[in-house]
């Protein structure tokens, strides 16, 4: 088993998924940006690039990395059974299905976990990146410019996000961002 040696959002998302499908994992290991891996012969890698390099180097190994590293390194991926019982592959369609199916407004600020969402086409280990800003910033002019940038990115960043192997925020969620 190859895992992140450093704390990471990728590890948090992966262990968040594992806690959602295994009571034993939840009890013994839990979720976090860094965890004590129970595998006896586990190997740590620094960053996604370190995990990808170790998985490619160690015959018969298995690990987890951000999707962009799977594509960039021509790595083999596996299908997973999602919450609806279907076996799905990781791709922009299954990631978007997980995002669209999530109840974004169930907590303030849309800060929810979207792992293991219901839906026939959902990839079960999907996460979202969030932008966190002060409600009452010290420099309001800088904050206004940052908000303008992200507004531009939401409206015009589809091509760039796809080039980086990320999924652009579905239109239905872009409308919801005004409520945050």
Where are these regions (language model features)?
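Short loop->beta-strand "edge-of-pocket" segments that line small-molecule binding or catalytic clefts
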Residues: 1-7
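Tryptophan-centered motif/residue detector
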Residues: 25-26, 37-39, 104, 123, ...
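Cyclophilin-type peptidyl-prolyl cis-trans isomerase
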Residues: 49, 97-121
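A generic structural signal for short, non-catalytic loop/turn and secondary-structure boundary residues
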Residues: 57, 70-73, 107, 118, ...
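Extracellular/periplasmic juxtamembrane helices and adjacent flexible linkers that interface
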Residues: 115-177
């Amino acid at each position: 088993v190859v895992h992140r040696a450093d704390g990471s959002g990728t590890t948090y998302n992966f262990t968040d998924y594992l806690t959602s499908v295994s009571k034993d994992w939840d009890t013994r290991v839990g979720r976090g940006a860094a965890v004590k891996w129970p595998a006896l012969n586990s190997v740590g890698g620094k960053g996604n690039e370190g995990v990808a390099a170790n998985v490619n180097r160690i015959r018969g190994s298995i690990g987890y990395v951000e999707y962009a590293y799977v594509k960039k390194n021509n790595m083999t991926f596996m299908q997973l059974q999602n919450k609806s019982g279907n076996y799905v592959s990781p791709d922009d369609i299954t990631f978007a299905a997980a995002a669209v199916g999530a109840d974004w407004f169930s907590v303030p600020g849309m800060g929810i976990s979207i792992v293991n969402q219901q839906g026939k086409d959902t990839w079960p280990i999907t996460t979202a990146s969030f932008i966190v800003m002060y409600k009452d910033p010290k420099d309001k002019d800088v904050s206004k410019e940052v908000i303008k940038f992200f507004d531009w990115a939401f409206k015009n960043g589809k091509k760039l996000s796809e080039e980086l192997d990320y999924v652009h925020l579905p239109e239905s969620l872009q409308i919801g961002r005004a409520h945050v």
